[in-house]
Every structure is written in C-alpha cells, then in structure tokens.
Amino acid sequence: MPRHTATPSPTASQPSRRSRRRAWIILALGLLGLGVLIERGARVALAPPGRAGRFVAEFDALLKPYRAAEGPDAWPEIATAITLRGQLETQAYPTTGSQNYDWRFDALYTPRGLLDNRGPTQDDIERAENAIRIAADLGLPAVLDRIAAARRVVRPSPEGEVIGFMLPELGYCRYLARYCAGRMALAARTGDHAERVAAFEHALALGRVCASNFTLIDYLVGVAIHQLAFERLRADLVDHPLPPEHLRAALAAIDRQPLPPIATAIEGERLGLLDTIEWTHSNLPNNDGHFQPARAAAAMGLITGSATSALHPARWPAPLGNLAGWFLPTKRQTTRRANEMFEGLQRSIAPGIPARERTTVFDADTWLESLPANFVVVRMLVPAFGRALESSDSAAMLRDGTRLALAIELHRATHSSPPDSLAQLVPSILPALPIDAVSGRPFGYKPPPDPAAPTPGY
C-alpha cells in the first residue's frame, strides 16, 4: 500500500505576512523606546547643575528687623571682642598657648573641671581672677558695653553654598560668655553689685547677637549663653543678695536683651535647605531638575560609609553618576516636601501653643521618620528640631523663672517679707505674670512658712 507523506503548508513553515509585520512593529517600537530612554538619560546625565545663592534676597528680608535698627552695628564689636580675647589668652597664660584651660573662668563657678573631674585648685581660681583683671585692662568690658547697647546686627550674608557658611564667631562668643559668668561669680563674692549686673547683661547681649542670625546653630548658641547667664545669676541670688536698685537693673537687662523668636531661625533653615536643594539638582528650563550625586558629593563631603565603594553613584564620573538622580524625587518634588515640613513647624510654634501641645499640631520627628528614604537631601540635612525646640522652651522657662525670682527678692527687699502670692508682684514690679512656655499655665508659687527666714534657693 503506497505511503503518503504530508506536505507542510506554507502557513505552518514560515511566518505569515501579518506576523512579520507585527514583529517589525514591535522591533520599531522597542528601538523608538530605547532611543527615547537614551535621549532622556542623556538629558539627565548632562543637564547643567543648579546654582547656589538664589535666596540671598530672602535671607536679607528675614534679617531686616535686626539689620534696619538705628544706631551702631554690634557685629564689628564682636570682631573686636574676639581680637581682645586672643590678647587676653596670650597675656594671662603665655607659656601654654590657647588650648590650655588651667586658667579657665569656670574655676570661679563650677566644682568640676572641663578636662578632668577634679575641682578647681586655688591656682586655677587665681589664674581666672588674674585673667579677668587683664581683660579689664585690655578694655574688653567696654567693648561688651557697646555690644549690649547696639540694636543692629549685620553679619555678612552667605555667598555660595549656605551649607558651607562658616560660623567661627560662635565658639568665641561662648568663651566670652564664660568670661562674663566668671565675672558674675567674682563680683558676687566681692559685693561689686554693679559689675555683677553689667556682666550679666553682657552675657545676655552676646546671646542676643548670636541668635539674631539665620541658622539654627546661631540660635542654639544664643540659647546656651542665656541659660548660662540666668543660671549664674540665680545660683548666687540667695547667698549674695542684690540691693533693690540692682535687682531692678537686672530685670531691665533681661527686657533689653531678649532672644529673637525661634521662628526666624527655622525660616533660615528652610531657606538654607532650599539653597542646597537648588545646587544639588540640575537646572532644567521648567525650574525642575534631578539630583546630581557626584556634584553633591564633591561639594558636601558625602563620600562616607558605603559611598567610598567604587560602585556607589557618588564615585562615578559626573555624567554617569547623575543617572542615579533619575530614580530619585525631582527638585520640585523635594522642594514641595521640604516646604511642607517647615510650614508644619511654623504652625506648631505659633504664639499661644504651649510646648506640651506642640506635637498635636505637627511632629517634625514623626514626619521625618515617615518621609520616604529616597528624599535624600531632606532626610540628610534636616536637623533634630525636637531637641532644638526643647532647648528654646527651656531657655524661655529659665528666663521667666529668673524674672520671677528677681521680682520676689525685690518685694522681699522693699517690704521685708516675700509676697503672699505672685499676684502681689503686678504691676508694681512686673507688668504681668509670665506664662510657663512648657505647660501654658501660670508659674506656681508657695510662700515660705516663715516669712522672716531666708529663701532656700531658686
């Protein structure tokens, strides 16, 4: 029986025209997509970088209240005080240089040394007292008088990247504040009431000047200086009481040397962050752009930890490394999230909101934890605002507590007894009773059982 062999049909042995057409279309679309991908990748990799300095006008407007005040400028006097501080170190202890703290002013008011756990020796105390005498001969108190009287504070605006703006004056101002604290302690022991109050106001003035600038660290240094001044005044208030006229002078000094609101520093941080976002992203015509890791690493020292690996985008040649920015939020998206956070912060510190209720309005730390990890610049550069706000609240509470302590002592000095309630201090001594910045409630007060007994302390 003959065997029949099946003949393959043309449609089974080769693609149909329709299949070939579909394959060509898919290939063409793939090549087109690849071309678009390459073109957009090249645009990201080769895009011109953003530039720093776009927000100089905003910085100037922010600081205008402190720069437009009438009278002399405090900032040149800060430079003069720093120069005298160098001369003071050289003359007070010429054999060891500026890094030796054996003649520190802390020896006059603290039981522990800065560099060890021993208390100050008599030699330490004598060196500190000698340094205070040398400072007076150099004219340092007179310079601090001019700083206290000056309402204007004009530190030069930042040029270039704000994040690289150096603040060397802050450390020197803290040194000068410790010098003032040493003067206060020495004057308390010797009964020089005018010198004690003058040194107190000098320290407050240094804090005010530092805090009248645009960064959070400026503000926190001002807070720390004020805390030191208030603590030193209160510590000696019972054992070394001030006469009524000097109690009034200390109250007036507090009113003359207030810290500016922390809202100014927070707005300065926002402008600084926007500046960093601007120059770490490319500059596209629609005011958008992509993060450029290589540029950021070169300018900010980002090559740490895993960034030291040769595989990390920050170590790639700039055009190639910039491709990593394609997978991160754009400049516009990053700016929007940064503004969202700072707007929430400003709402939370509005007048009338006590510290205990602040996080119910906006919790910066919780917000930052919930921010996606790919918002690199925001997550990396936003400071710990929770701690900063706590320091500000603490300084406000210490200021108002010191004001009340001075008022109570003034009432005692003029009436031979402490007040029965804080209400007796108004309006003869204080225009109004302060409110606790933390609780939002009035300060508590319990009069001593024996009005004739000395105050146990503040």
Explain the meaning of each model-derived region:
Residues P2-Y458:
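Short acidic linear motifs
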